[in-house]
């Protein structure tokens, strides 16, 4: 099915002429356009102000005529009814705008960035932990990101999570400390937390400016350009008064002195990372004030662009009060990379990885050995890859009432056709390499698909191998841990409900639909209770499906304790009125090491599916050429492999003990081409059936021997509380919930961790906060400071935990949790189940 979908997508793209060769554009103009493109995302913890900041960006760019409000439900990027009613972002939204607006930009002859209007493709992402996968699939296609921090709460748990994910993709990031107008906002404390929790050295480019008498947040001090910006009154943020250093000395002498300290600290901190600026600093006798702003911006960019996260530019503002947005947009233009400055996107071809440029240039992945499946890569040639007209990654699929299915793509090679303004599609003449846009009319495309335009191919078999299995930047979909039954109101509604659920799953692959074989019920699985609640709301209210969702339950798994002996069977019966015959053997064993390690060592056809390894082993065959010669005329090695794999997947979807899906098993299908295949009687359906029956028989035999176990989801829980509540939280986790505490402290998430050395936060420059209860030198040693508990807890014990943690912490505690692994259910917990 997957291959079929890819073929249809490719066929449609070829009809669209998705190719840069179809348009006459000078190379110079094209390079100028791509150099002035920024693909960025807004990432943060929930309620940090992502959507509010995005709305201001759209307003100041001239794309909208009024500022949308989250509380009113009038935002552009939160356009789903569920988003507007709940006031949270559920889906990533794509929007394109120019900054500065075209009417404010002028032609530049010296290349100064401020005179050029840039195209910014912006993705506003969710902050809730249930929608982490939505963030992940957006991160794949970004060239840079703006991380927004709540100036009151500081670095929060989900912030660390998404920061770690961006670190894995090596995405350059800048930080915007938001909500500095709020009571309790502490810019200095938040900056220190960037160093202690995110492990990046904060380069403080802006500092907050407060009124002397009232302490009200009025603007920012720009340490790079040595100026102060004052946003006057309760305006729309366009009335800005700028003060140079001489004027600032008259207006606010104390802030003038602080801004000088900030400039000196900024230059000295950057010199530790950039040798070029260090030499320039030495040339002016260590005078940080005499270095021009262009040199500082260029130096920060050099440190930032590799995505290492070692230096973190920090900016200040208050989005709701319209303060600080325009300088933030300038920083996006000046600091974040264009598409040509990012590393070559990773491509997977049958579990082997290489760069896209290697494919387009006909070069091979260096580590090909005797692996049968990777040997097909040797057929790559310049004549083969030179025909690739376009290549794009589907990172999102959405349904539109007027235009049907919209397929969001990031173009990596070639050009084509629409751009999105959140919920509105705007047709454009073409979509260049490096751009983000939308294609309509792709009936079978799903999130994660790779789109290739290839001329003159056979629509039945698609482009030549191995181009028909190329995958751009593949990511693993985390296993769903909650499920609920979907019950249509009548038999006549079943088809419509199933089709509607299919649309939801195309949009969000972290949802999963299965059918209970005993009851026939449709079971919808997801990443969390909120995730499924949103799916239910969309199913009933948006798509008007006549169905009811049952109670949300936990999704358990089954696994095997010991390896089974080879179970060899022969399938010989009619399928659709035609004789079908095939044979194979099956061995099932538990996975005792990482599946990826096994994948790298095996010399057979091996795939990973839902936490299981599936291997197809052909006896007495050493190469694809030899194998294909032995197969019946209507079969190929890839078709045999996919048919057998589909049969195994079907068998593993339902265990013998409690009908839960199998997990953490390694299934090996053994097939002798000479004795297990029977000419024309061996069809793909026969191969799938014999593999399914062989695995099911082996599982039943294992169950009769008491070797099938139950697994439950184990969650990694991050609880934020104050010192006074810490003891109660730890006791509750350990005693009442059957969990175990992994660590206490400031809570650096080791699994997503930033692979950088710890930073001495006492060396970090921060201005004095507008109010301070104590002199904060770190986040862990003061009574009343926020602490974080990292624990492993069974998912069942975390149901309804939010109310409980509020009770234990007097309403001040928060938590997030993410799936960690499936763990064996034992003793009392197994008996209760």
PLM region spans:
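Short, surface-exposed connector motifs at secondary-structure boundaries
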Residues: 119, 143-147, 170-176, 308-313, ...
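P-loop NTPase switch module centered on the Walker A-proximal segment
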Residues: 28-148, 204
């Amino acid at each position: 099915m997957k291959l079929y979908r890819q073929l249809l997508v490719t066929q449609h793209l070829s009809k669209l002429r998705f190719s840069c060769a179809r348009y006459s554009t000078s190379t110079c103009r094209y390079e100028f356009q791509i150099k002035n493109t920024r693909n960025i995302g807004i990432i943060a913890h929930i309620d940090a102000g992502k959507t509010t900041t995005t709305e201001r960006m759209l307003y100041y760019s001239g794309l909208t005529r009024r500022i949308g409000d989250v509380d009113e439900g009038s935002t552009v990027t939160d356009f789903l009814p569920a988003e507007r009613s709940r006031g949270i972002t559920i889906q990533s939204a794509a929007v394109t705008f120019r900054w500065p607006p075209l009417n404010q930009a002028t032609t530049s002859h010296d290349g100064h960035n401020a005179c050029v209007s840039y195209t910014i493709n912006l993705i506003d992402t969710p902050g809730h932990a249930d929608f982490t996968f939505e963030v992940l699939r957006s991160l794949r296609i970004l060239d840079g990101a703006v991380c927004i921090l709540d100036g009151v709460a500081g670095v929060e748990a989900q912030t660390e999570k998404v920061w770690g994910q961006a670190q894995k993709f090596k995405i350059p990031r800048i930080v915007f400390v938001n909500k500095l107008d709020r009571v309790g906002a502490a810019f200095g404390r938040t900056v220190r937390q960037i160093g202690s929790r995110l492990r990046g050295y904060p380069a403080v480019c802006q500092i907050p400016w407060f009124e002397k008498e009232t302490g009200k947040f009025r603007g920012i001090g720009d340490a790079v350009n040595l100026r102060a910006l004052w946003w006057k009154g309760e305006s729309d943020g366009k009335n800005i008064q700028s003060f140079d250093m001489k004027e600032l000395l008259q207006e606010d002498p104390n802030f003038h002195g602080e801004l000088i300290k900030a400039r000196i600290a900024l230059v000295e901190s950057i010199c530790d990372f950039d040798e070029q600026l260090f030499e320039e600093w030495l040339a002016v006798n260590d005078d940080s004030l005499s270095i021009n702003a262009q040199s500082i911006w260029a130096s920060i960019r050099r440190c930032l662009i590799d995505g290492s996260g070692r230096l973190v530019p920090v900016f200040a503002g208050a989005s709701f009060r319209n303060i600080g947005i325009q300088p933030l947009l300038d920083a996006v233009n000046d600091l974040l990379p264009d598409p040509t400055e990012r590393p070559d996107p990773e491509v997977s071809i049958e579990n082997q990885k290489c760069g896209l440029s290697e494919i387009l240039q006909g070069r091979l992945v260096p580590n090909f050995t005797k692996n049968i499946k990777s040997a097909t890569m040797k057929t790559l040639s310049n004549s083969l890859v030179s025909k690739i007209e376009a290549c794009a990654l589907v990172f999102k699929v959405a349904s539109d009432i007027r235009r049907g299915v919209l397929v969001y793509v990031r173009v990596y090679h070639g050009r084509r056709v629409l751009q999105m303004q959140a919920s509105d599609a705007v047709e454009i003449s073409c979509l260049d390499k490096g751009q983000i846009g939308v294609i309509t009319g792709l009936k079978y495309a799903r999130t994660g698909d790779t789109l290739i335009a290839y001329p003159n191919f056979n629509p039945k078999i698609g482009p030549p191998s191995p181009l028909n299995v190329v995958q751009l930047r593949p990511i693993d979909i985390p296993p769903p841990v909650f499920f609920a039954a979907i019950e249509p109101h009548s038999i006549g509604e079943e088809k419509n409900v199933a089709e509607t659920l299919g649309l939801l799953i195309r949009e969000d692959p972290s949802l999963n639909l299965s059918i209970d074989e005993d009851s026939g019920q449709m079971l919808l699985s997801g990443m969390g209770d909120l995730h499924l609640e949103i799916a239910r709301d969309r199913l009933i209210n948006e798509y008007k499906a006549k169905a009811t969702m049952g109670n949300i339950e936990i999704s358990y798994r089954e696994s095997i304790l010991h390896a089974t002996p080879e179970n060899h069977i022969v399938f010989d019966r009619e399928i659709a009125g035609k004789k079908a015959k095939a044979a194979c053997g099956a061995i099932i064993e538990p996975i005792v090491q990482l599946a990826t390690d096994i994948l790298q060592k095996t010399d057979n056809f091996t795939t990973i599916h839902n936490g299981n390894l599936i291997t197809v082993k052909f006896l007495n065959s050493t190469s694809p050429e030899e194998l294909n010669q032995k197969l019946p005329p209507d079969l190929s090695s890839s078709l045999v492999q996919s048919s057998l794999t589909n049969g195994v997947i079907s068998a593993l979807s339902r265990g013998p003990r409690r009908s839960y899906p199998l997990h953490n098993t390694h299934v090996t299908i053994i097939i002798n081409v000479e004795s297990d295949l029977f000419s024309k009687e061996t069809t793909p359906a026969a191969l799938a059936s014999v593999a399914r029956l062989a695995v099911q028989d082996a599982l039943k035999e294992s169950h009769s021997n008491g070797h099938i176990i139950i697994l439950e989801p184990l969650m990694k829980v991050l609880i934020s509380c104050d010192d006074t509540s810490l003891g109660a939280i730890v006791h509750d986790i350990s005693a009442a919930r059957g969990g175990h505490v992994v660590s206490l402290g400031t809570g650096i998430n080791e699994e997503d961790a930033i692979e950088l050395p710890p930073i001495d936060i006492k060396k970090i420059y921060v201005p004095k906060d507008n109010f301070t209860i104590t002199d904060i030198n770190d986040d862990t040693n003061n009574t009343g400071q926020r602490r974080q508990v990292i624990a492993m807890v069974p998912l069942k014990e975390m149901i309804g935990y939010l109310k409980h943690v509020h009770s234990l912490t007097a309403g001040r505690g928060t938590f997030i949790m993410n799936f960690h692994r499936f763990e064996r259910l034992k003793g009392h917990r197994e008996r209760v189940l």
